[in-house]
């Protein structure tokens, strides 16, 4: 599986997921600098107030 892994509004980059990982995620939240976005492999649990979208196809998390 190939997932996007750039932060916030950086130029899109991708990474190959290892260990049989079959999810990509896009996590979004707001802090004192504005809206933040994190992307990567897996589907982590998140704290209240953080939005997450997990998906299972190549580059689905942009």
UniProtKB/Swiss-Prot annotation:
Disulfide-bonded cysteines? 3-24, 17-41, 43-54, 55-60
State the SUPFAM superfamilies in the record.
Snake toxin-like
Expression sites by tissue: Expressed by the venom gland.
Q: Which InterPro entries match?
A: Snake_3FTx (IPR003571), Snake_toxin-like_sf (IPR045860), Snake_toxin_con_site (IPR018354), Toxin_cobra-type (IPR054131)
Short name of any one Pfam family annotated for the protein: Toxin_cobra-type
Annotated GO MF terms: acetylcholine receptor inhibitor activity; ion channel regulator activity; toxin activity
| Disordered: annotated span | 1-23
Instruction: Point to the regions of Polar residues compositional bias.
Output: 1-16
Its keywords, alphabetically, are: Acetylcholine receptor inhibiting toxin, Disulfide bond, Ion channel impairing toxin, Neurotoxin, Postsynaptic neurotoxin, Secreted, Toxin
Q: Where in the cell is it found?
A: Secreted
Annotated GO CC locations:
extracellular region
What family, per the record? Belongs to the three-finger toxin family. Short-chain subfamily. Type I alpha-neurotoxin sub-subfamily.
**Record function comment:** Binds to muscle nicotinic acetylcholine receptor (nAChR) and inhibit acetylcholine from binding to the receptor, thereby impairing neuromuscular transmission.
Q: What is this protein called?
A: Cobrotoxin II
